[in-house]
């Protein structure tokens, strides 16, 4: 878990505040998709113990953490497991994910430009994130301000327009926040 451990040690206070705010978006009985990002993984620290949910995830770590809650039904999407992220990827995972429906997808991203282009270098996982967004009534982007950059890198994953809400910290670039407002995307800014 060296990769996930190293990601989870960056901007810890921000990630925890973002994760805590994300919990407020859950309703008992919801069917949700939980992404494999370190910010999304922090949600388990704040979930009410007895909340009833159905959680689907490709993250092996998240599946095990959510499975500790008595009223959370966990569906772990299978497939080839990445050595770096400890999450499933590939055609088996994609096919299953495309057959499901979620009220909300909580998505973490590695990189987003000020104008809202989301990119990644994790080619196997890009298709899964796209499918989760497509299969969800609502998609929420969870990202600390360190993810915002000037230029895109690698492969396009999505755009800001694919999300109904962004939860980020108070150090987020003002041009990025203005872009969210212009696109009428709900923004929740948290203080670490």
Locations of regions flagged by a protein language model:
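HTH-adjacent hinge/linker in prokaryotic transcriptional regulators
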Residues: 1-36, 44-52, 66-72
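Residues at secondary-structure transition points
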Residues: 2, 6-13, 17, 38, ...
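Glycine-rich SAM-binding Motif I of class I
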Residues: 41
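An N-terminal domain-start capping segment
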Residues: 56-57, 190
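Conserved phosphate- and dinucleotide-binding cores of soluble alpha/beta proteins
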Residues: 63-192
């Amino acid at each position: 878990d060296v990769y996930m451990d190293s990601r989870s040690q960056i901007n810890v206070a921000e990630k925890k505040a973002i994760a805590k705010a994300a919990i407020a978006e859950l309703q008992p009985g919801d069917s949700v998709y939980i992404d494999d990002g370190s910010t999304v993984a922090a949600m388990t620290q704040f979930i009410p113990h007895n909340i009833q949910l159905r959680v689907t995830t490709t993250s092996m770590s998240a599946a095990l953490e959510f499975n500790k809650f008595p009223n959370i039904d966990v569906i772990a999407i299978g497939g080839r497991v990445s050595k770096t992220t400890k999450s499933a990827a590939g055609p088996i995972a994609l096919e299953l994910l495309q057959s499901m429906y979620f009220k909300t997808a909580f998505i973490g991203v590695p990189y987003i430009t000020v104008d809202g282009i989301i990119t990644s270098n994790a080619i196997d996982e890009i298709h899964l994130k796209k499918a989760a967004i497509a299969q969800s009534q609502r998609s929420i982007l969870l990202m600390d301000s360190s993810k915002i950059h000037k230029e895109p890198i690698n492969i396009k994953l999505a755009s800001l327009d694919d999300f109904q809400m962004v939860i980020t910290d108070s150090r987020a670039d003002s041009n990025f926040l203005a872009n969210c407002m212009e696109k009428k995307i709900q923004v929740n800014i948290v203080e670490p």
